[in-house]
Amino acid sequence: MATGLTVVVPAWNEERRLAVTVGEVVAAARRHLGEFEVIVVDDGSTDGTPAVARKLAAKFPCVSVVRHETNLGVGAAFHTGLTRARFPYLSLVPGDNAFHESGLDAVFALVGKVEMVVTYRANPRARTPMRRLLSVCCTRAMRLVTGRPIRDAHSLYVFPVAQARQVRRNTGYGYHIETLSTLLRGGVPFAEVPVQLNPRPDSSSKVMRLGVLARLMATMGRQFLRFVVLREKVRFAPVAAATLTRTRRRPFALTRSQREVA
């Protein structure tokens, strides 16, 4: 089984934390992976993030930088990385250093040993009660939609690129709900591992904004309609490994309708 991994690191105004995040990603990847790349997606930052990203690309040959001219959101950053990925597996690691480096070790160690990795946060009390309640609700809804007993629906993942590219493009914050639920319904085998959160103020997390919460619920509701009410079947077309390299530099652009969804 192939083991190459593309790591997407979205960053919006993360000049203080991006270097630490990328440094830990590269260190963990070197410990566990034979081949990997890191794609930093500067999502329209207005602070010193672009300069930090350029320095990281100069320091680490495995790091490349893609810039969105305006802030499009984490879902758009995910799809930018997915479109450009050169390897058969992909993980998104937030540029705000939300996860402890030990979690990266646990995740990267499983790349190529199972088709998909789903993590669960072992120290959820590092977040506020409201954030924990949101996570519990999201996880229970994901179990209902997919019929799979996962422990956490909102953490780190490793997705198989060939299958993830066949999932409906969701450029909003609910990209992970769309992708994870579709892959689980499609029968992609997975393993679960615990990860640790780094303490931080929840006020810095965009997931707690009302507009974001509404879009998350809308995405989950649409998946419930598809898979529970309409009993839609998921079938993935076989994709040759060579396809990954042929599409690795295709430009990413959002249509007006996609911007409205995001």
Enumerate the language-model features and the residues they cover.
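Hydrophobic helical membrane-anchoring modules
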Residues: 1-5, 145-147, 170-262
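Short loop->beta transition adjacent to catalytic acidic/histidine clusters or analogous donor-positioning motifs
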Residues: 3-5, 26-40, 48, 61-64
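Conserved sequence signature across two-component system core domains
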Residues: 11, 41-43, 68
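Short, well-formed alpha-helical segments that are part of the catalytic scaffolds
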Residues: 14-29
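Acidic helix N-cap motif at the loop->helix transition within catalytic regions
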Residues: 16-20, 47-56
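Conserved donor nucleotide-binding strand/loop of the catalytic core
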Residues: 36-39, 50-84
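A conserved acidic beta->alpha catalytic loop
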Residues: 42-51, 97
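Acceptor/aglycone-binding surface of glycosyltransferases and processive sugar-polymer synthases
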Residues: 68-84, 89-92, 98-173, 200-211, ...
